[in-house]
């Protein structure tokens, strides 16, 4: 068997899992072997095996904001999970671990540290998560997507995204020849965002019919019926779907996106070259979505609209002020932020550390 063996540690949310999958693809394309350390009863347990990657799991959940009983049990739980992670590392003869964040990353990283196995971390958000902050002290390489997440020199690599998104034509080429109403894409993540589902139809109803953009709105799981009913009741036309399976085409055809500001969303917007009205999820850990959004706004690639300020009237005012020229400018500015080789950069850093 040729190639080295890498253990990717990521879980909890798609924002950790999908960038790690992109790196896994890059490592395997180079002839290396990948296993995955995740949590039991988790999103990664459902997703990762579909990609043909061996999944090992630890019985661990997050502690921030949880009950006193779980916090009191933390030392015992950590001891158990570190021991189990050590067993997994030895079993697979892992030569380097790569941490992307999530509950499982810390015990996996600590196990690697105790065994003398090199650690690489990749931070997807503008504010580093708890696991990665701790592991950064021991990591051989600290990589990050946003300039201020860490101060380690040479670590800015961006967030890994799918190649078919990065390979979209540049904004000027996509926008060429477009006329008529703006085409706006609304996405609140796979589960949707209730506040967007409620406010966007109301805002459009406040605009004159000839000033309303053409909407393509992802409702999120289980919310399509109520969203379509709201649009219909307000007399607003919109194309609503529960889940968009072809995001590449959705990005290609849109002039603008209304969305949350998760790390993966920001990475895809910049890779595609699309401006956005960003409504950060207000309860994200360390309010990292607001910091993510500011990264785009400071580059004049969109607007930040805090959820506390999101009203139908405010959104209607913003939408009424937009034109395709402004959307194109935002899209071009977004594209300048893209780091399209991120997955390969992370993979190559890990390969060097395992040497």
UniProtKB/Swiss-Prot annotation:
Pathway: Cell wall biogenesis; peptidoglycan biosynthesis. It is an enzyme of class 2 (transferase). SUPFAM superfamilies: UDP-Glycosyltransferase/glycogen phosphorylase. It is a peripheral membrane protein. InterPro entries: GlcNAc_MurG, Glyco_trans_28_C, GlycoTrans_28_N. This is UDP-N-acetylglucosamine--N-acetylmuramyl-(pentapeptide) pyrophosphoryl-undecaprenol N-acetylglucosamine transferase. Cell wall formation. Catalyzes the transfer of a GlcNAc subunit on undecaprenyl-pyrophosphoryl-MurNAc-pentapeptide (lipid intermediate I) to form undecaprenyl-pyrophosphoryl-MurNAc-(pentapeptide)GlcNAc (lipid intermediate II). The keyword Cell division applies. The lineage of its organism: Bacteria, Pseudomonadati, Pseudomonadota, Betaproteobacteria, Neisseriales.
